[in-house]
Amino acid sequence: MKAATIARGKLRIGLLVAGLALAGPSTGAASPMLVALTGDGMLITFPAEHPGDARTRKPSGVSGQLIGLDRRPANGLLYGLTAAGDVYTIDPVTAAGSLVSTLTVPFNGGSRSGLDFNPRTDRLRLVGHDGQNLRVNVDNGATAADRPLAYAREDPHFGRQPLIAATAYTNNVAGAETTEMFDLDSGLDLLVRQEPPNDGTLRTVGPLGVHVPPEAGFEIVTDGGGKNRGLAAFASTLYDVDLATGAATSLGTIGGPSGSIVGLSTIAGSP
């Protein structure tokens, strides 16, 4: 992608964020701008504090079914993955996609999976409902297959098959020196830590208090002071997720088309 094209895309994103932030609450802090991917492939953009104030776009230039998306901290661009393993950049304003690479190892998770960039290593993590655990260089598609997901021997859920529906990393900013990886288990309705990520070892944090469907979105927003905030979206509802306990609190219904949410991400320029 040419530098001029990227610059224009970032300008459009900045204008969208600024415009929608004006409609947010006057709390002294701007509301994070989010984009959700629906099960039928639509993009819904909205502020976290007012999820009903949404704009919907249909992606163009993407071949196949999108199964997840995330903003890459290293460059601020939004990336999407298709069921065929193709990686695209996606303009969150126009929803136009541009092919970047293709995974060298097939990912079998489909939309029942988690997808998020590790901000420290600049690699895209993919975790599937079947326990698959991949690490991707999105620039060339080079994919490493790490150890399958499993609960730690000392965890109360050791021996249970994890059914991971979404994943997210803390310290979600460029150049992060440290990060933690969290997953949502839809079989047990839990928030769990994946520690260490490459080993696929899961450790229970706590119950969400709500049912997590097999298709869900999860994002961790890091503000300018380094504070991490968990946000999850499923069944057309946005939730705050306490990363210390797992407790989920509803923030309201997401506007736009009803149905499943399969991905959630911030937009570049959000706090």
PLM regions: where:
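Conserved beta-propeller blade signature
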Residues: 33-37, 77-80, 123-126, 176, ...
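A short beta-strand motif characteristic of beta-propeller blades
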Residues: 52-61, 96-106, 145-157, 201-210, ...
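Bacterial N-terminal signal peptides
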Residues: 14-23
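Structural signature of eukaryotic scaffold interfaces centered on beta-propeller domains
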Residues: 67-75, 106-122, 159-177, 214-226, ...
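An edge-strand/N-cap motif at the start of beta-rich repeat modules
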Residues: 30-49
